[in-house]
Amino acid sequence: MEQMLCERIQIMFRILSAFRRLNSFQIIVLGFAFVILLGAGILMLPVSSADGSWTPFVNALFTSVTSVCVTGLVVCDTGTYWSSFGHAVILLLIQTGGLGVVTISASFTILSGKKIGLSQRSIMAESVAAPQLSGIVRLTGFIVRVTLGVELIGALLMAPVFCRDFGLFRGLWMSLFHSVSAFCNAGIDLLGVRGAYSSLTSYAYDPLINLVIILLIVIGGIGFLTWDDIYRNRHHISRYRMQSKVILSYSLALIFIPAILFFFLEFQDIPAGKRILVSLFQSVTTRTAGFNTADLSSMRESGQFLMILLMLVGGSPGSTAGGIKTTTLAVLISCATAVFARKDSPEMFKRRIVPDIVATAIAILFMYTSLGILCAMTLSILESLPLIPCLFEAISALATVGLSFGITPTLSVPSKLILIAFMFIGRVGGLTIIYATMSGYKIQCGKFPQEKISVG
């Protein structure tokens, strides 16, 4: 008995010592994986489903992944398949995924009065894409306060409409759930009671619901670092960091330009006044959230392809959104502009972009487009479906958006597993997973000579 106890203690110490040797990237990946598996285990239980039956593991895992990775693709209608307990579990998973596993664990550490060590600060900075370690504890507190405060305000603003339609207590719950889902850019809804997988189509012309959801999505998608910059510098725009200026300018452009295109190219059967609301909502939700107020499958292929491009771009660094990020798009555009103007280096807001950032932006674009195309081709082969719906589904999963033409519930198990992997990659980050599998930075003792190669 004593020997068995000693062996177990030795195993425990080996596990603890192994965790101490993990780098920040590995801890982030394992943290998300642990929460996902825990959520899947709970969602499998009969208490989580509305009819009291066991949920197949793949469906429970898919739901847990889409919640933690704040995607929104679902294989079961969230509003009708899951019980109230299941809805609460999904909401907690969304909140955990939106804030980040590291941010939540760090918040509990701060509340307990314990000191945050240097290694913990490094992990915290990496998880929210902070440029430096100084002030990371203050930033974490700011993130939690802003998140909970904005979600509460959003819930209170939507409460009158949902309480009118669903009664007081259920209406308050619906308001809270959709506020958290919108701010975290999850796009998961409970409105299946009005039609399976109907999302927000029953509120397509409701100004209050549309505008509140739009604001929540935008606030969550801009990024905590940007809001911290705005909070500290207020109206002194000249003091903003270059990254904040890039995010704000490109976010505005990516909201209004697609909205204008949607208004003139799509939804022609809707009156002009209501079409403005639908076009604006679809422009905002396409890049990050996954809610929809219109039938996407009835759109033209040009409109569908525009949505694919918007999903690929996604939100901003340090936010709850996925995609290659607005800053990556900005760097790529500035690189092209520099080449056209025959400049030595790309520039934005009177600042030069360092070569390492340019190389990273190119690598991210190559990785996301390659993975998206590979996933789309695989889904098309496995499911015998046209390429456009499969490409839409693939980019939606990889960019953690959650929009779909309605094919997700009909997919086979292999296709569901592929989307699970892609949602995980999209939320954690492709580069994070790559760095997590590498032993460390390789120091080059020497460099090869340079030589030019013809391109273009």
PLM regions: where:
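Membrane-proximal intracellular helices of multi-pass ion channels
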Residues: 1-456
